[in-house]
Design a protein with these regions (language model features):
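Active-site HxH/HxHxD metal-binding segment of metal-dependent hydrolases
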Residues: 1-40, 44, 122-130
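Active-site neighborhood of phospho(di)ester-bond hydrolases with catalytic His/Asp-centered motifs
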Residues: 1-2, 50-53, 68-70, 106-111
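Active-site-flanking alpha-helical
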Residues: 9, 60-61, 78, 118
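Short glycine-enriched, charge-decorated loop/helix-capping segments at active-site entrances
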Residues: 16-19, 79-85
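Short active-site segment of divalent metal-dependent hydrolases/proteases
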Residues: 5, 57, 74, 79, ...
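Core dinuclear metal-dependent hydrolase active-site scaffold
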Residues: 35-62
Length: 136
């Protein structure tokens, strides 16, 4: 967990009540994640990119031709910024950063279909004015 998400985790029980869902307290994180860290899972290594906006400590993992994107970028959409602790300006900066990654990286969002960085930069209406032009 990125340390900037400590407040998000702290308010999770309240949020669960507000949204009418059950919440089971998770175990304490065994490690803090920071920009540029590496995380190895199943023989694959991913780089950590801190991309606040949807949440203060939101991170994505990229490497091996993929981006594990959480709620940053979706096919044709982006993560919500109307939630407590979300930050629209930070989201815009994070989206600009993710769009600097290679066009052919496959993005697996937290939910919804997979997409690519290039496809989203070319066609995602939420990236207008945020992303650099598509490479030809």
């Amino acid at each position: 967990m990125h340390p900037a998400d400590t407040p998000t985790l702290a308010r999770a029980p309240q949020a669960a009540i507000q949204y009418g869902v059950e919440f089971e307290t998770p175990p304490a994180p065994d490690r803090e994640l920071a920009e540029g860290d590496s995380l190895s899972v199943g023989g694959l290594t991913f780089s950590v990119m801190h991309v606040p906006g949807h949440a203060p400590g939101h991170v994505v993992f990229h490497g091996n031709g993929v981006v594990l994107g959480g709620d940053l970028l979706f096919a044709g959409s982006i993560g919500r910024t109307d939630l407590p602790l979300a930050d629209p300006r930070a989201m815009e900066e994070s989206l600009a950063r993710i769009c600097e990654l290679d066009d052919d990286l496959v993005v697996y969002p937290g939910h919804g279909p997979a997409t690519t960085i290039g496809r989203e930069r070319a066609a995602n209406p939420f990236l207008l004015g945020v992303a650099r032009p598509v490479r030809r």
